[in-house]
């Protein structure tokens, strides 16, 4: 990857999000852990997965809790159960949320790969 020419951190950050390859986007999909999970596992943040229970901390839906329905790697967004808006024609559409605006309160499935990540 070529380095951006700008010296401004905000432009460098935008460039990173726009040009990151799919296998590099895992780092951009981390969310903070709740105090209980942080104390239990000794980690501050971990990658969000489908099935995790999260609490939205910022934005229009702050305070809402629900399960992660989908993780969109291409757009670096997640969709949460119950976080929808109504379109003009009456259909419900899920609102994509950036993972940095949520807190993981409970893990969905803890398989072997995630166990290794938590035990590191």
From Swiss-Prot:
It holds the Pfam family KOW. SUPFAM superfamilies: Translation proteins SH3-like domain. PROSITE patterns: RIBOSOMAL_L24 (PS01108). Keywords: Ribonucleoprotein, Ribosomal protein, RNA-binding, rRNA-binding. GO terms for biological process: translation. The keyword Manganese does not apply. Belongs to the universal ribosomal protein uL24 family. Part of the 50S ribosomal subunit. PANTHER family: 60S RIBOSOMAL PROTEIN L26 FAMILY MEMBER. This is Large ribosomal subunit protein uL24. The gene is rpl24.
